[in-house]
């Protein structure tokens, strides 16, 4: 990939994002525990670039790659992209845009990779279902057999969320 093929030549990694992300999860300070790491955009991006995935273990104090992730994290610069902020607050869009690119030691820049609506965004919820199922089955494994987890997943998908929510509201409103 773009990162692994050129990582020795990377001087800086630039992430353009919206203001709330900059304010809430950009964290260049020392990360002293899993909660700190889980709330650091720089940590998450570094781990994803190096290991191609992020799991709950990625945030643990005993994670084998923590030093490598922290070293790469120091090369990351997070900046606000005003257009991303505008699109984040625009009700008809509610984009959660991010763009990443690399500045190399020779001063050149990589191609920019931009995502306006990540998987899980309301505009892409259906795309998230296979990933959510995989995660559900994997995390249910210690408690359920695979077949049981799959059956439970299928039953969850059959729930009529709207009517269930309305029923809950009626109960809360004493109707």
Identify the function of each model-found stretch.
Residues 1-175:
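Terminal-appendage/accessory-domain detector
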């Amino acid at each position: 990939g773009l990162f692994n093929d050129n990582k020795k030549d990377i001087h800086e990694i630039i992430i353009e994002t919206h203001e709330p992300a900059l304010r809430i999860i950009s964290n260049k300070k020392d990360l002293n525990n899993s909660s700190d790491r889980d709330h650091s955009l720089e940590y998450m991006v570094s781990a994803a670039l190096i290991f191609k995935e992020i799991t709950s273990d990625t945030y643990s104090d005993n994670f084998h790659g923590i030093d490598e992730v922290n070293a790469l994290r120091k090369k990351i610069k997070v900046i606000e992209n005003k257009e991303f902020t505008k699109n984040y607050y625009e009700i008809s869009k509610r984009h959660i845009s991010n763009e990443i690119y690399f500045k190399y030691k020779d001063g050149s820049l990589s191609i920019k990779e931009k995502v306006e609506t990540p998987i899980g965004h309301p505009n892409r919820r259906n795309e998230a279902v296979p990933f959510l199922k995989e995660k559900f089955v994997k995390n249910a494994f210690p408690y359920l057999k695979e077949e049981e987890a799959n059956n439970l997943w299928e039953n969850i998908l059959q729930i009529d969320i709207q009517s269930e929510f309305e029923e809950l509201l009626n109960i809360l409103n004493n109707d």
